[in-house]
Amino acid sequence: MSAGEEAIVASGNDNEGDQTNGNHTGKTDEYDPSTGSALSNFLWHGGSVWDAWFSCASNQVAQVLLTLPYSFSQLGMLSGIVLQIFYGLLGSWTAYLISVLYVEYRARKEKEGKNFKNHVIQWFEVLDGLLGTYWKAVGLAFNCTFLLFGSVIQLIACASNIYYINDHLDKRTWTYIFGACCATTVFIPSFHNYRIWSFLGLGMTTYTAWYLAIASIIHGQTEGVKHTGPTKLVLYFTGATNILYTFGGHAASAVYWAFGDALLNHSNAFSLLPKNGWRDAAVILMLIHQFITFGFACTPLYFVWEKVIGMHDTKSIFLRALARLPVVIPIWFLAIIFPFFGPINSAVGALLVSFTVYIIPALAHMLTYRSASARQNAAEKPPFFMPSWTAMYVLNAFVVIWVLIVGFGFGGWASVTNFVRQVDTFGLFAKCYQCKSPVPAGVAHAPVSALHHRL
């Protein structure tokens, strides 16, 4: 989940009547620490800087962690490691820029006498207050689209993962089942506190990442393993754009080391690891995490939709649930149409993450401080490792140009090409994407290694 997505998710903490409106009063109930036990305060009460880091860290990997080894097989080990570090640094920089813009917006508004007590500042408010309504609309459009497809990916990932515990049902059937389960999020009024979910999410993804790394090392390299590396530009840039999305190099490199080119046809890392209790535990934890992430991603979309149709003041939970169905049903439908776990991640990374995480924050920072007076009165000066404002502008310009050309341009071309190829190969509404081919009766007792997987 990107920093921009974190901003829209923050709207879940606002009062229901004012959700997603960049100019709302956004009041929330003041939490009284004396009303609960020390344990409940520790687990439930949020809102601190640490909670922001917990939330970002717990949502940063999610299901994309399982496709990073697939990306490494497209890139090769060296390029994979280099790009992980490179995009990790760029992502950290743009996250810093977003925090600077938040501070700047708050400082300017406080000078005007605005009180931010019990108010959750949203990313769209920041863009609106610093750069105008056009920027607010752009930010809202990109983030809502990102959340929409992020929710689709969670459903696809749920079906893909559970299949490796129970393959008696095909992935499309599992998508029906998990779509129905995730549709129950329409009954959730809002998320007032995130800390417990952040703890859980961080624990689940940490376990899965280390399971992938340790299980791959213990398994060792498969017989005749090959690490061909990049063979086609389409594959190379497809893998590179998936790394735009997240960070998890220790798991990805270990799985690629063990299985090599076999990952080119197995976008979900679980598919190659031996079935045992450790893997089943990782699958179950990821399923829970994906359900939580689906709720985090969908809830702000519900608020936007309620605002559009004028249902945001409705007190009835059932009426609001009915009003939210036009949001969740298309998400469910899209997950059934395009079940391409892996390729869809790269497409979302290239076409949406490029802007929400990298381009928009860097451009917004450049335009906010374009005048000498803005730089002179800035609430946050350049960091100690930046010698001047000019250096910051150069770095921001590099981020914009690099991501626009390499991430959105080449990455978008490669990801869309690969996505279309999956549609041509498997068709829409694919019953079981990358599942085992049926075993003919004559070879029913052949060794497991003789079974092959579809592309």
Descriptions of predicted regions:
Residues 1-70, 91-96, 118-120, 430-433, ...:
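Membrane-interface "cap" regions at the ends of multi-pass membrane proteins
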Residues 3-7, 44-45, 50, 102-143, ...:
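Membrane-interfacial loop- and helix-cap regions that link adjacent transmembrane helices
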Residues 49-66, 179, 242-249, 405-407:
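The first (N-terminal) embedded transmembrane alpha-helix
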Residues 63, 88-100, 179-187:
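Central hydrophobic cores of alpha-helical transmembrane segments in multi-pass inner-membrane proteins
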Residues 66-71, 125-129:
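Generic transmembrane alpha-helix signature in multi-pass membrane proteins
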Residues 67-77, 189-198, 250-254, 262-269:
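Hydrophobic, small-residue-rich membrane helices and short re-entrant helix-turn-helix hairpins
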Residues 69-113, 117:
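Extracellular loop-to-transmembrane helix junctions
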Residues 71, 184-189, 333-339:
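Hydrophobic alpha-helical transmembrane segments
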